[in-house]
Design a protein with these regions (language model features):
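Acetyl-CoA-dependent GNAT
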Residues: 7-91, 95, 100-101, 113-114, ...
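Short loop/turn motifs at secondary-structure junctions
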Residues: 78, 93, 124-126, 147
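Preference for well-ordered, secondary-structure-rich cores of eukaryotic proteins
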Residues: 15, 72, 104, 110-111, ...
Length: 175
């Protein structure tokens, strides 16, 4: 089990921030425009302290029928993951989805979304939901291209953190 858990831990230390979305709610519909940064920057997501927490978190998924982890392997290397749980609102909540940087653009993220859809339908859920930040332009565009729609924007979720300029964007894919 521990080897599987270690396979699950993908170190996505740095994420390139090239721009952000500017969501707009009008006539009961969310739209967004893109703003590209003149100077992209790197954001760190995980440090060494998180490894132990991540292993413990993964163990919660074993033999839990309301949670699942899918790992994507290529050439015997774990290059992608998605963590899902059954949410109270009859959606499958994507807690984490990641593809190693060198393997992006090869359809792995789409494959992880597709297996998530299959799991949610098998659980008789009504769709997928997830949260990301407005300044994760690459992820926002990916979710939009997969058919997700913005359901809400939370301006206070990250207010007590160092990067308190970020807004939480909640995305939904209904079926």
């Amino acid at each position: 089990i521990i080897d599987t858990v270690r396979d699950f831990i993908l170190y996505l230390k740095l994420c390139n921030r090239t721009g952000k979305i500017i969501p707009r709610y009008e006539n009961e519909n969310w739209t967004f425009t893109e703003l590209l940064y003149e100077a992209p920057y790197l954001k760190s997501y995980q440090d060494e302290e998180d490894e132990e927490d991540e292993e413990a978190d993964c163990l919660e998924y074993i033999d839990n029928t309301d949670k699942i982890i899918y790992l994507y392997y290529q050439d015997d290397k774990c290059v992608g993951k998605v963590k899902l749980r059954k949410n109270w609102n009859r959606y499958a909540y994507i807690e984490d989805i990641a593809v190693c940087k060198d393997f992006r653009g090869q359809g792995i993220g789409s494959a992880l979304i597709n297996i998530s859809i299959e799991w949610a339908k098998h659980k008789n859920l009504h769709g997928l939901m997830l949260e990301t930040q407005d300044n994760n332009l690459i992820a926002c565009k990916f979710y939009h291209n997969c058919g997700f729609k913005i359901g809400s924007v939370d301006t206070m979720l990250y207010a007590n953190f160092e990067n308190n300029f970020e807004k939480a964007v909640f995305w939904y894919l209904r079926f």
